[in-house]
Design a protein with these regions (language model features):
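N-terminal metal-binding scaffold of metallo-dependent hydrolase/deaminase domains
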Residues: 1-46, 57-59
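Active-site gating loops and adjacent loop-to-helix segments of metal-dependent hydrolytic enzymes
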Residues: 74-113, 158-179, 242-267, 292, ...
């Protein structure tokens, strides 16, 4: 059981806040937290039950990661780099992730599922994430339990499928089987009834039809209507591979973006993951409808595909950064987004540090309708990520935002507070046995890796 929040004062050598609607960096200020809210930001030391007064911290709003996959990332880790697992199809979604995640969840005990969930949440918190949206198969409800137990602000997004058994054959053609839509929506509703709003609203749900090629028209319409009825975010993978685009064209004579628009799904409430195979016309359509793109550059770079943050922004789309299924490293994604954007645009002025920081703070909060997140100001939720800027690779320091994007890494995360609770200090989770969690999670993943079908998938 986590302790209740207490009055806390944290000193920042630099504090990222706002002035007249824009980012502002304050020098040598204190952030005072009372309960679950920020009470004040002041240059003078306030009274508090807990005082964190060490200099050399850069205080940021708690970082927001709107697209992450704990389980599939661990499944693929060190097995799918350098082209492994994708010889018969460019996307490991259909060769590794979908078949092995389903097989693994059928195989696991509840304890093993919880071990995997805890390991993922631990990595996220230690990496500076305060809020995470996590699409996952509904056979892993332990993601909710692990987030609640370890203090993460969590938007669980259990998948809905019309065809849950999409898998690429030896010829590279994806074949779709199953009809799980009604059952998945019922399971989503059950999870919503159990978890929505737990711990003062820290645990929430998002609707998550898996992708345009695995969800038929009826399911997409029904899921979207349900999300709008409940006022929860709606997220889906869109045009994440050439195969998906070809499938939707063959079925419906449309692109994935046009398909969603035809169904009434494309709108300001839609969080569209990846979109790497969207045309310029598709992106213009999405911008007109007000959709948000969830950009995850490193997972596509691993496959030799460009996913440029600046490209989506140039089409007028609100674009935020997520980790997807690669390394759960949000700071690493910011640097990758900067490098990939600048090199593909042949311009040093795109994807600036302030823009990228907004993509994991203010813009991400706006995408889910949370004006109390992604900002350090009185009245906002007490979610804080602090970077230790005293390391040799961060000194001397002139502009802390540029240092965060270009020089820092997740090992520099010093403090993470969520909902007024100090969870991470000195880079370690205060309420978790990190060694035990790591060992148990690794053992559970190893159980899947040992399966003959897993070894064949990784070699394919």
């Amino acid at each position: 059981m986590l302790p209740e929040p207490r009055t806390t004062a944290i000193f920042g050598s630099y504090v990222l806040t706002e002035a007249e609607g824009a980012q502002a960096v304050l020098r040598d200020h204190w952030v005072l937290i009372e309960g679950r809210r920020i009470a004040a930001i002041t240059p003078t030391r306030p009274e508090a039950a807990l005082v964190l007064d060490r200099p050399g911290r850069f205080l940021l709003p708690g970082l927001i990661n709107l697209h992450n996959h704990c389980f599939s990332e661990m499944l693929a880790r060190t097995h799918t780099e350098d082209g492994a697992g994708r010889k018969n199809n460019k996307s490991i979604v259909y060769t590794v992730l979908m078949p092995l995640s389903r097989r693994g969840l059928d195989l696991y005990t509840p304890e093993e599922r919880m071990a995997v969930a805890r390991l993922g949440v631990l990595q996220l918190l230690k990496g500076g994430n305060a809020t995470v949206m996590e699409p996952f198969r509904n056979g892993l409800p332990e993601m909710f339990a692990a987030a609640e137990e370890m203090g993460l602000r969590f938007y669980g997004a259990p998948y809905l499928f019309s065809t849950a058994d999409a898998q690429a054959g030896a010829d590279g053609v994806v074949r779709y089987a199953g009809d799980d839509g009604a059952a998945d929506l019922a399971a989503w509703n059950d999870l919503h009834a159990t978890w929505e709003g737990r711990d003062h609203g820290r645990i929430r749900l998002a609707m998550s039809p898996h992708a345009t090629d695995t969800c038929g028209p009826d399911l997409l319409r029904t899921a979207t209507a349900r999300a709008r009825e409940l006022g929860v975010p709606n997220t889906i993978h869109v045009a994440q591979s050439p195969g998906e685009v070809a499938t939707i064209r063959a079925r419906h004579g449309r692109t994935p973006a046009e398909y969603l628009d035809w169904l009434g799904v494309l709108g300001p409430d839609l969080l569209a993951a990846h979109c790497v195979d969207c045309s310029g016309d598709d992106l213009a359509l999405m911008a007109r409808r007000g959709a948000t793109v969830l950009n995850c550059p490193r997972v596509f770079a691993r496959a030799g595909t460009v996913a440029s943050f600046a490209h989506f922004r140039a089409h007028g789309l609100r674009t935020v950064i997520g980790t997807d299924g690669y390394n759960l490293d949000l700071l690493g994604e910011l640097q990758a987004a900067a490098i990939i954007s600048k090199t593909t645009a042949a311009s040093a002025t795109v994807a600036t540090a302030p823009e990228l920081i907004d993509a994991v703070t203010r813009d991400a909060a706006a995408a889910i309708g949370r004006d109390d997140l992604g900002t350090l100001r009185p009245g906002a939720a007490a979610d804080i990520t602090a970077i230790d800027i005293g390391h040799p690779h961060l000194q001397p320091l002139f502009e802390p935002r540029r240092a965060l994007v270009w020089l820092a890494n997740r090992a520099d995360v010093d403090v993470v507070m969520v909902d007024g609770r100090l969870l991470v200090e000195g880079g370690r989770h205060l309420f978790a046995d990190e060694a035990a969690i790591t060992a148990a999670g690794a053992a559970a993943i190893g159980k899947i890796w040992a399966l003959p079908e897993a070894q064949a998938a990784f070699a394919g």
